[in-house]
Amino acid sequence: MNKTPTTLIIMDGFGLAPAADDNAVTLAKTPVLDKLFKEYAHTTLSASGLDVGLPAGQMGNSEVGHTNIGGGRVVFQDLPRISRAIEDGSFFRNEAYNKAMDDCLAKGTSLHLYGLLSDGGVHSHIEHLFALLQMAKDKGLTKVYIHCFLDGRDVSPTSGKGFVQELQDKCAQLGVGRIATVMGRYYAMDRDKRWERVQMAYDAMVYGEGHHNSDPVAAVAASYADGVTDEFVEPVVIDGDGTISDNDSIIFFNYRPDRAREITRAIVDPDFDGFQREFFPTTYVCNTEYDASMPNVLVAWPRIAVKNGLGEYLSSMGMTQLRIAETEKYAHVTFFFNGGVEKQYPGEDRVLVPSPKVATYDLQPEMSAFEVCDKCVERIESGAYDVIILNFANCDMVGHTGVLEAAVKAVETVDTCVGKVVDATLKMGGIAMVTADHGNAEDMKQPDGSPMTAHTTNLVPFILCGAGTELRPGRLADIAPTILDVMGLACPEEMDGKTLIVK
C-alpha cells in the first residue's frame, strides 16, 4: 500500500524582504510560489538570533537552521557556548586546549592556530582566536603561529584586510603570535573533495610553498588590487619559520564541521589519499567534533546530544523517511538535521546528487536542482516514504557569489522545482511544506552598492500545502512539531517547539 507522504521542502537561503533592486527573490519570476502563497495557509518563521540558539541579532546559517528544524527545539549553538566559556573562564581550563599547549612546552614545539578570520559567526569568531592567544601568553608559549583563512562570504568580501590588521594589533598587544600564512577559505575550507585547492592550503602551511610577502596586510591589499577578494586570495606565506612540523600542536578554531573536515583529514589521517603528502604526528585539536571517524584528534567542545529529534523519533515509530539534497547541502539534511549525529536511522534512506564542478555557482545557478527534483518526484511516486526532507541549495550557494543576475536565476530554478515536488506530493494525497533555513538571496547588495554575500536575519516563509488551516508566526523549531501534528503523531517531550497550526 502506498504511503501518503509529508514532504518538507527547504529552500536554502530564501528570505523575505521588501521588493528592491537587489532582492533576487522579488526580482525573480516565481509563478509557483506566487500561486502557493495565494492558495494555501502560510506564515513567517524566525531563523536567526535567539530563536535558533545564537546570540541576539546573529544571522542564521544552514547548519544551525537544519539542526533546529530537525531537533524540533531551539538548539544552543557552539558560538554562544564558547563565548560564554570565555566570559566565565572555563574556556581557559579546556582539557584539549591545555593538552595542545602543554605538549608544546614539553617538546619545545610550535603552536599553530588556524581558522576563519572574521566575526561572521557562521564557522568561527575572531574573539575565540584572541582568547586562545591570551591563553598561549598566560602559559608562556613563544612559538605561536596563526594561519589566517579569509572569509568574504559571511562578511563583506573585502573585510579581510581589516581583520588581519586587527589580529596583528592583538598579537602586538599581547606580545605573542605571528601570522604565518594568509589564504582564502576557497582553498583551506573546501567541502567538495576539490583536493587541488586543499593541497595549495596544505603546501603553504606545511611546506611554506606559495606566494611570499612578509607583510600580511599588504599581501591582502595586493590581492584586492588584482581583483581577487578575500574568499579567493591565493595562499601567501608570510613567515617561513611558521610551517607545521613533526610534533607541533594545532588548534583549528572553527566550530562548524563541514568545511573543517578536509584540511583536518589531510593532516591527521595516515590513510589520507586526496593528494600526495607524508604523514607526521601532531597534537591536533578540533574545536568541535568534525567527524566521528577522524583519527588522531582531540575535541575541545564535544557536541551536546539532540535526543529524539524528528529523524530519530520517526524511526522509533516505525516510519520511513527520505533525505535528499545535492552535495553542498547533503550534510545539512543528514548530519545536521540529525543533531550532529552521523548515524543513519532504521527506515531512513538518503539520496546524494553531486553538485556541479564549477569554480563558482554563478556560472551554473541551476546547480543540480533539476536532478534533485526529478529523483525526489520519483521517490514520492514510489509511495515508499512517510516523510521526505528535501533541500534546494541554489538561493544560498548562488547568493554567496554576490552576482545578482545569477541569484535571480537560482530563485527561478527553485520555483520551478518546488512546483513539481508539491504537485507530486499532493497527487499522492500527501501534504507539502515549503520553507527556508535562513535568508540570503533577498539581499544582494551592501549599502555602498558592493556585493552582499552573507546571510541575513530576515524572516523565512512557511507554506502548508494540502491542509487548509490557519497558521501562526513561529520559528524553525516549530516545523518538526507541525510535521508530527499533520501526521497525527504526538511530539516527544524533548521537543519544545510548538505546532504552527492554530487549533
For each of these PLM feature ranges, what is it?
Residues 1-503:
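Feature captures the catalytic ectodomains and active-site-proximal regions of enzymes
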